Amino acid sequence: MQSELQRGFVLHRRPYSETSLLVDLFTEESGRLTVIAKGARAKRSSWKSVLQPFTPLLLRWTGKSTLKTLTKAEPAAITLPLQQITLYSGFYVNELLTRVIESETPNPALFQHYLKCLTGLATETNVEPTLRLFEFQLLQILGYGVDFLHCAGSGEPVDFSMTYRYREEKGFVASLVKDNLTFYGRDLLAFEALDFSDDAVRQAAKRFTRIALKPYLGDKPLKSRELFTQNILLLK
């Protein structure tokens, strides 16, 4: 059965046989799926230049198994201009989606978050607020429910000036211990508001999302993070 024409993006692509590609897509109506792009590696194939990350596409495919066959791919708009840090940030977002969301699970809301994230990476001078916002939105969609407004121990509202220690599967508990799991109340209130305009809040948010995403990512390192680190070292 052939799918309806859908908006989507390439998350990742790799060789498949001598002339084809195996392509991980993220689509608006069908979520993440893997397709074979037959002949895409051939010299005269128009798909070779079309099937690139960060290019908004119109896509159609066929097949009932988990591995579909791509039948149509054309640009819906120009490729978003990501380069250097923004490019590696885009690869990071793509790898997150590839690693943590289930295949063929429709999620139009996440697609919109992803589209806004890429647009933000392409237009904003600082990538950090855009990345932190997307990570928190992704956690919400994954069902990661944590209360940023109340102490998990007492039920009292979070105090702006107090410190709270994160306990997995429980939440934030008022604590005087200061370590990697400790956050200020002002950070938690900003997390709830999805307000990452302050640099200190962004640093705390980055620390929290690494903790929160670890159960979904497992122990396997993110390749995009390694590439980014290598690139920074080369630039020094």
UniProtKB/Swiss-Prot annotation:
It holds the Pfam family RecO_C. One of its GO terms (cellular component) is bacterial nucleoid. The keyword Zinc does not apply. Belongs to the RecO family. NCBIfam families: reco (TIGR00613). GO terms for biological process: DNA recombination; double-strand break repair. HAMAP family: RecO. It comes from the Bacteria. Involved in DNA repair and RecF pathway recombination. It comes from Haemophilus influenzae (strain PittEE). This is DNA repair protein RecO. Keywords: DNA damage, DNA recombination, DNA repair. InterPro entries: ARFGAP/RecO, DNA_rep/recomb_RecO_N, NA-bd_OB-fold, RecO, RecO_C. The gene is recO.
